[in-house]
Each structure stands twice: as C-alpha cells, then as structure tokens.
Amino acid sequence: MKKFIYKYSFGALLLLSGLSGLSSCCANSYGSTLAKNTAEIKEESVTLREKPDAGCKKKSSCYLRKFFSRKKPKEKTEPVLPNFKSYADPMTDSERKDLSFVVSAAADKSSIALAMAQGEIKGALSRIREIHPLALLQALAEDPALIAGMKKMQGRDWVWNIFITELSKVFSQAASLGAFSVADVAAFASTLGLDSGTVTSIVDGERWAELIDVVIQNPAI
C-alpha cells in the first residue's frame, strides 16, 4: 500500500512540475516571464541561417565554396553578320540551284512537306545568305520559273509573310554594312529597266517588301 502511495505521489509531483514549467513558458503579460516578441524570433532565425556550413572548418573555404557554387549568368551572344559578296560577283550554279529549291519549296510544298523539308531549306538558305541582295533580286527577275514561284508564294499569306520578314532582316543587315552603294543601285535599276530614283528611294527607306514587289511586277524577261 505504501509503495502505491509513493508511486502515486511521485507521479503527481512530476505532473505538477510539468504544468508549472509549461505555464512559465507561455505566461502572458500578467505572468513573471514575457513571451518572445516577433523581433527576437526574427533575429534568432537570421542568426540560424547565417551559421556557416558544418563541413567548413575555415571561413575562407566557406566563402570560396559559396562563390564557385553560384550559377553564372549566360553571356548574350551577338548575331554574326553575313560577309556579303559584291554586287558584281556572279552567282554560281550551286547558288542558283539553292535559290530555286527554296522558292519552289515555299511555293508548292504543303505545310507538312515544308516542315519535313525544314532542314534542307535552312541549309540552302545558309548557303545563299551572303549573296548581295541586289544580285539575288536580279537572279529572281531574270528567271521566269522563279518569278512564277514568287507569285505563288504571294498567294500563300503565311509563307509570304515569313519569307518577307526573314529576307528583310538580311537586307537590313546589308544596308547597315553599307552594301547598297549608289553605283550598285543605279546599275541594278538599269539592268532591270527600272527608274533609278524610285529604286534609290525604296532602298534608302529600307522598304524591302516594296522592292521585291517591284521586281516581281517588272521581271527582266
């Protein structure tokens, strides 16, 4: 019986001591101990976050590890401008074949066929990218099949818009490099039987869609 009383008394004592400890931790403004305010909690959390890595024995090694572990931002690469040929440089047979392939593909192939031939088209475009813009337009104007293909492309709005947009970018790059000399523009207009002043105005204004339309409507054939 005594053993039971001692055991019960000891358990009650532990329970009371636990409750008193809990009440002291959570006491309000009327208690003897105040709860931690928000600022103190924030300070402790900041302190905990600022502790060095457990694996770092020296501060210098920790800083170096953090420095080299940071991801470096990717450097922006500037687009490489084409090294345009001279207007007087004649187009090669392979360049003419590539030009013909691009025009015929854009004019005749279905959307699915164009997607499947995307790699071939890009390859052909890259090979004719450095042809002088006026020499390229002259080659178009002098080939009836290419003129017919260009007119078909005009009837396919989405194809034509992409073609004009990409071609205009290249022509503007050429203009920024000073590829359109007064003599070249005059020679181009004379060869195609166009008004030199009109062509000069179009080139100076970089109205490339208009220039292409003039060539299509006035072929040298």
From Swiss-Prot:
Keywords assigned by UniProt, alphabetized: Cell membrane, Lipoprotein, Membrane, Palmitate, Signal
Signal peptide from the UniProt entry: 1-24
Name this polypeptide is given: Probable lipoprotein CT_734
Membership in a protein family: Belongs to the chlamydial CPn_0875/CT_734/TC_0107 family.
Residues with lipid group (S-diacylglycerol cysteine): 25
Membrane topology category: Lipid-anchor
Keyword Cytoplasm: no
